[in-house]
Curated annotation (Swiss-Prot):
Alphabetical list of SUPFAM superfamilies matching this protein: Glucocorticoid receptor-like (DNA-binding domain), P-loop containing nucleoside triphosphate hydrolases
GO biological process, one term: DNA biosynthetic process
Residues reported in the UniProt entry to bind Zn(2+): 145, 147, 182, 185
Protein name, as recorded: Thymidine kinase
Active site (UniProt): 88
Complex and partners: Homotetramer.
InterPro entries xref list: P-loop_NTPase (IPR027417), Thymidine_kinase (IPR001267), Thymidine_kinase_CS (IPR020633)
Protein transport recorded as keyword: no
Keyword annotations: ATP-binding, Cytoplasm, DNA synthesis, Kinase, Metal-binding, Nucleotide-binding, Transferase, Zinc
EC number(s) from the headed UniProt entry: 2.7.1.21
Domain of life of the native organism: Bacteria
The family this protein is said to belong to: Belongs to the thymidine kinase family.
Native source organism of the sequence: Jannaschia sp. (strain CCS1)
Amino acid sequence: MAKLYFNYSTMNAGKSTLLLQASYNYIERGMQTYLLTANFDDRAGMGRIGSRIGIEAEADTYTQSDDLFAKIDARLKAGPCACVLVDEAQWMTRDQVWQLARAVDDLGVPVMCYGLRVDFRGELFPGSAALLALADEMREVRTICHCGRKATMVIRVGEDGNALAEGAQIEVGGNDRYISLCRKHFREAVGDVPV
């Protein structure tokens, strides 16, 4: 039975590496996969998913106005596809997550999403919130803070190296802009969040 999966973490935990490894495992067994990523994430090149360890693969892109059910349906009509893998899933809209759930339920294709749980302010992304509500299975991908504790938060740093508390929720960046921390060190970096 097909399921909707959400593999979540903070930055630099290896989510894209795990996605690419899962795709490779299917391909190695003679099955095709359908990779999706946001059209504005060009860190590995437009229409590519890349990992920090140097592996990458081509992917179809989507905008926040695309109907992901329609994209998956069209891909399945073009030929067999064993699995859909979505990178940077936090950037999907709530409606797009529902479209993925519909693809799982109505088209019978497993969908594996990989993304951040919270942003640099400690708030859920809309796509992540919807996935936490709708996913059949959720898996935490672990990484560590500089202190050795499990990192569950991320800060965005400015050019001066200081943590930022304001700004757009979506800003594509990598190791130079984001640092994964445990909650204690997140609070030390940005201060306590007002209740």
